[in-house]
Amino acid sequence: MNCYEHTIIAKQDLQESQVKKIIEKYETLIKKNSGKIIKTEEWGLRNFARKIKNNRKGFYFHIKFDGSGKTIEELERAENIDEMLIRYLTVRVKKHDFEENFFEKKDS
């Protein structure tokens, strides 16, 4: 199995319950396709530098998981037809980094 990091951006006009359902949907999809969830992070509502598909903001989620090519194939197939999503990105990494969350608010 390979290590992956997957980021999803969902539309800004979703309610909190819809956001939770999206996360659960894709976590379940990863598990059903022989993947193993390592960590899921909600980065919250963030502004875009420019409009993307007529949206100025989006909800960001980040999932770290172990999986195979089949897992990625099924994940991205489902995301292509999901109208609640704006963008997604899957990156293969050598190992999962647990040291720092770049979007975590830090106290000064």
Q: Regions from the language model: what does each represent?
A:
Residues 2-108:
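Structured, basic alpha/beta domains of bacterial-type, RNA-associated proteins
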